[in-house]
Amino acid sequence: MSTEPVSSLALPAPAILPTTPIPASTQQASSLVSDQIQEASTASQKSVTSITQPPIPSQQQPPQHITANHPASIAAAATVALSATLLNPNEWNALASTSMVTLDDLRSAFLEQRQQQLKDLERSHRESLREMIFMSENYDKEDVAGSPWKLGQSLQVAEDDAREHVKSFLDQHRLALDPKMSIKDHILEQPKLLRQRVSQELKTGPIELAPPPTPTSATAPSAGEAQRDRDLKREIEQNNLHRSQAVARAAAAVQAHAIAEGVAKIKPLTITAAESQGVRVAPLQPGQVPSFVIESTTPIAHIVASSDSSTAVLVASDAQKVDSHTTMSAAEAVTPAIKVESTDNIDASPSKASHALEKAVSPVPGLARNASTQSTSLRVPPSPMVVPTIPENITAPPLHPTLQVLAPNPLSVTYAASLRPLPPDPTRRITGAGLSGGAIHHRSGRKITSLSNHSNVNSYSSIAAAKIGPAGSGQADLYRWYVRARASPGAGMVGKADKCLMTSDWRVAFNEQRFVRAMARIEKLKAQGEWSFRQPKKQKGPVVRKAHWDHLLEEMKWLQTDFREERRWKMTVAFHLAHEVAAWHRARTPAERAQFCVHVQRSYRHRTISDNVEQHNTDKLSAKEVVSSSQPFQAAAASLDDVEMTHSTSSSHIQKDGEPATVKAESGQPVEDADVTMDGGADADEAVTQAVESALQTTNEAASARAEEMDADGEDDADTDANDVEAATAALVSGEPSKPPKVEVVREPLSQPQPMPTLADVSVPTTSSATPTVPASSTPTTAANDKLVHALRSQPKDADSTLTAEMPPQLLATLRAPIFSTSVTTTVVSPAALLDSLNPEAAAALLGIEVSDLANAADLLEPGSLSFSKMFPELPLYGGVSLPESNSKSDRRWDEGSLNQPPRLTHVTKLLDSRPLLVSTLEPSKNRANGRWLADSDWVVAAEQSDPLRGVTDGADTALPPMPGSLLFARKSNRAAKDASGPASTTPAEPASPDARAALFVWTPDEDNYLMTLAKQYHNNWALVADLFNSTRLNTATDKREAWDCYDRCKRIEQAAAEGKPPPGPPPMPAPAADADKDSKKGDGKDADASSSKRDKLSKKSGSKHDGSKRKQRRSNLMEVMRRSAKRREATKQAQQTQQTKKVNLNTHETHAQIKAGPAITPQSLSALKTERDQAALRQYYEQQRAQLAYQQQQQQQQRLLAQQAQAQRMAQQQGTAGTSAPAATAVTQAGKAGTAIVAGGTGGVGNVSLLPAGTPAASAGPAGQAQQKAATGQGTNQAIAQQTQQQQQQPQSQQTAQMQVQQPPAAAAAAQQQQQQQVQLQSQLQASQAAQMQNLYAQMQQQQQQQQRQQQQQLGQAAAGLAQVRPGVGALTQQQLATLTPQQQQQYHAQLAAATAAAQQQQLRSQMAAVAAAQGGQAGFQLPNAQAQAQAQAQAQFQLMQQQQQQQNVMQNQGRPAMAQQAQQAALQMYQQQQRQAQMRPPQPTQPFAARPNARPGTAASSQAKPQAAARSATPAPPMPATVQALQQQLAISLATSNLSAEQINGLAIQLYKQAQQQQQQQQQQQQQQQQQQQQQQQQQQQQQQQQQQQQQQQQQQQPQQPAPTQQRPPPQQLLNQAIQALAAQTQKNQQPAPTVHGVTGSPVRPPTPRPS
């Protein structure tokens, strides 16, 4: 160390830093993630990470500094901080391996983490953009705060900056999937002032920019190291995310000091020594990442070179690639100030430093640090990374003593490197630690590769998923599985399963038990010391020479490869030609089409050899004269008999002067190098003609000689070859032989191309466009080309001669990088072009030599020394098939048991294939950390040195034959083999007792399938089939199938398949002959049980005679136990049958409904029983409520009846006083009342006739009355309701007329009495007609009921005849009939009965709704006094009908009810019936008098009676809800309570009715408005008519004042009655339309939901 003071670094503490700036490591990680998302964000991140100068804290809060003078203290701080901040996933793995964390929790955590990462990425991206704006504005300003000379606390633009260009920049380059503008389009000006300032301070020459590296970095490793480098890079980036800013700057400072001072200056330093030198550890707060804070109180010193220092300092700076046409911008900041010492005071010069140190401290790994000492300029190489990567390739120290003992020679190390990795530790798999333990010889980073597959390497869930579970474990741990299977075996779960299990489920449990027993056996053998983990190597057998068959197979494989590749080549050519033709047709203009064409000379007609021979037989003399001059051409033609001669091979080069020149025979130049042009008008050249004739003659002779040697099968090939040669030479001949063509040879100058040999084999023909022609006169160039071509030939002797020993992999990667950037259609690669693209300085740096020394290594970088096999040593080179030499062809047969082939022995564990190595030998405490082996441990370094390719051989061994596995014998069609179903080639020997032998084995379906597969595959080679069958299944020594067993089983299966039957089972065990004779001697009187027992005993004895094995004995015992259990089961069944009582079986002759007893009670049936019990309790509650309500209603009706009687007496007294004053009006009123008789029908068709008061006179019913009776008799429910409504509307008119008559003068008393008598007679007649009508209706009802009963009896008879299906319409069955039914038939009967009851209830609900609508519709007008009684009578009829319909249901339902519930229900029904009878017996109430005008006349009453119904309805306000509606509501509640409808169905019905009511109410309101308008018009007209009538009556009274009132002409009562009946009939026909709505409820049927069957 120099005695001069070393400059220190001022690094602020992260604890006091504001949260605004983002650390460089975070920005670097953000750049890594955004590189996968968007290219724009990548460029911005790279531009941001170019800042290497740390921010200085604000002046208001000066930090406390601690001096650290030694760079080793900084290295110690960085090392400790890195080890402290590494992630430890043990806790996460332990949590995820338990049941506390579910898959949903992991998914939600992963989703939250991804969302947070996206937010952080967007935030960091915007901060990076603001920093980029700040940097672009202030990097070249010296006096502005924020420039490299005056760094502020924050290096970014404020978030609230409102400048327009800032907003537009942030908006253009925001983070998005569809960016509008890339960050590459943002051009940064070159920092010229900054470079000048740096050059002035460093006292160096002008700063130059180093050229950018090749597309693939100079440090691109080989294929074997690429994966390790990527994994290591990802791990470093993951750790950098959790580093602090101080640690990153400390690492950069350590690198800078290492560059200046050399590797010898950095010594290991402990944490204690570091603390003594000024390094302190920042206090760790909860949730804070630990970091080291290194600060200094001394100001930053600039780099000043010593007087005797001539070493150029390389200052790292970051640059950004602006565009492909722009240069690289310089760095915006420099590294911390470093004191540069003189080279004399440095112990280890940088020029003499090792290559590993240069690569470690270089910002761009791979570039040399040994620049020329005479250079005064400063070279700034591009460096996109602020924090350098950890040195990877370090010079290996000497081997550890233990390693030297274990590995005395490289051969043992190579053997250890080829071994497989050690198995993992089962006890440490749960926490994730120790995963892939002992993996020091991994051929690929197994653990890191699994982690690198995830999109985010920092994701805790990704790490946990990779380390936990079968998917991420990588290796199966049998011991762990064995422990878990013993703790919770699947067989126990299968045995207690409550669901249906398939055969595969049972097979899983069976296999698990087999494996558990196998593992238990292994553990037992381990305990006894009989289980070995070592397997001796197979002894190599004697050498087997190849036979003729082996050579024939090789030739067949070669032919197969040739044919397949030729077919692929033809398909490829056809593909390209088709696409080119399609492109030519798509071209629109001739110019575009001309670009697809190649301008060649016109082709000539091909002539056959025979024609040429006939034409030239006459010119043999002239041909002989020129034979001596055409010998070179003959030699060339003889050597190229089988080579196709293209136009380019027969063309020669042209002279420069362009003058014609003749071809002379004595010049010696080959004719194939002459470019001959045919011209009919030119003179013939005699020499050319002779040469052509000589060529034809030589070709014919060669063809005839070859045809004689070939057999008949080769004649076609000979003709084809001759045609090919003739096609190349016939272009020179045209015309008759007596007149040779005129040939003119023209020579024109061609440009001399640069020699460019192709990287291909000579045996592969190349086209003229790919290989440029070389002049024949240039002999040195041709020789060089021949040398290069032969050098690139892929021969077996050159397979191992690669440049890996002389040329490093980095240089190879750089050299072959341009190959990957070429087009996919390029087929020729020039080595010279590759060498020209290589940078000499980069090549010198990679080779570790000076640029001036590259001339000495020219032999390595010559075009002739490059080939594909040398540039790609790790890849096999595919080339043409070359003929092997006679002595190189191996005559040894491929040994199936060699070490290169996988053995046929069962692979139990990986320890059998690996050399045992104790873990303590590896020293895990020193060489293992954080679950993986350290890269710089002695074992890893030794393994890499001994075997860099990690077991991958460097090139294939050409002496060995190709690996087996050819597709030569693969069947390419789906047709079966011809001999698949034929007889066996060799039938095995039949045993002594084949049937007994076949009965010993039980074949499972899987075994049958496997046996048939083996038989088809090995063509009935039964010995091999039996061997394979026994070796691939777990069996005992006694359960071994012989060849005959396999043959017999296949034969039986084929016979069964031919007959269309399934595979047969084992045949029965034959009985011995002696026992059979004894059985035959016995009589047939024995029962079946005795004979079966005898047979079982005999089979047992015969079974015990076979071999006396334990398996036979166990089988016989099992059969005996099965026989006894079956016998015991039969005895128990017979005892149960005798105990049961005999019942009449109605299904004796029923063959279609043989159904067994019902299954056990299911949860659904239990819930149904519970529902029935709850419904019964609910019905009982409602019955009690109804009984109480009926009692209350009875009391109220009695009180109301008393009040009505008292009121009737008072009204009678009032009528008696005023009755004498209006006899005429009373008569008219009574007549009107008689005409408004109403016939009301119930819902079930029962008509209840409401009679008028007894004082009304009767009248004979005329034809109109009879018609009205018939119409009323035939009407249904809706017509009856409409008649009731009409009656209620007509009633106020009669009452008004009666009131007007009451107030008439007393002069008409006599007439009133007479009128009253007539009304009494009329009333009696009306009552008689109504009684007759009721009798007719009652008779019709009885007829309908009788018809229904007959139908029910018929259906019941059908059900009794065939009880397979119970009809819904049948009535209730008796207990005897139900007892005869089976349980399933009873269930079916109950379901159908419930459906029929539900249908009846729905019809009843519809009728009740119609009745409610009718009663409510008549509520708006005046009602008769006895309307309530009529409604109650109608409700009574409805209730009776409902009671009749529910009798069938109650028969079954009441059986399950308790006696108290039935009695309560009967009492409630009786009370309700009594209440209805009392309501019918109640007398009618008298009408109340109305105030009439004094001048009222009989005509006025008539006119008022003729008023429409709507006027009376609109004039009278609506009274409260009548008793009729209440009764109907009560009846509806009773019906719902007695029904089986659930609460949900009732609510649904109510909602449906409510919606329909709303819709219909709106329609009714609209209709009412229209009717009101029409009624108003009619009223106006009637009023005018009434006024006219009144005026006429007054005139008549004035003219006849003395005439008494009874003498007026009035219609007789019979006419009034007929008019009333006609009006009622018309109104009835009008009401046949849908009934009017009452609060939205219509007479239309509303179908409730179908009730559930009980």
From Swiss-Prot:
Residues 995-1048 form the Myb-like domain. Pfam families: HSA, Myb_DNA-bind_6. Residues 1061-1071 have a biased composition (Pro residues). Residues 1-66, 204-229, 609-679, 693-720, 883-902, 974-993, 1057-1159, 1257-1304, 1449-1523, 1570-1654 are annotated as: Disordered. Residues 536-611 form the HSA domain. One of its GO terms (molecular function) is protein kinase activity. The keyword Ribonucleoprotein does not apply. The keyword DNA repair applies. GO terms for cellular component: NuA4 histone acetyltransferase complex; nucleus. InterPro entries: Homeodomain-like_sf, HSA_dom, SANT/Myb. Residues 710-720 have a biased composition (Acidic residues). Residues 613-623, 1075-1096 have a biased composition (Basic and acidic residues). Component of the NuA4 histone acetyltransferase complex. This is Chromatin modification-related protein EAF1. It comes from Mycosarcoma maydis (Corn smut fungus). The lineage of its organism: Eukaryota, Fungi, Dikarya, Basidiomycota, Ustilaginomycotina.
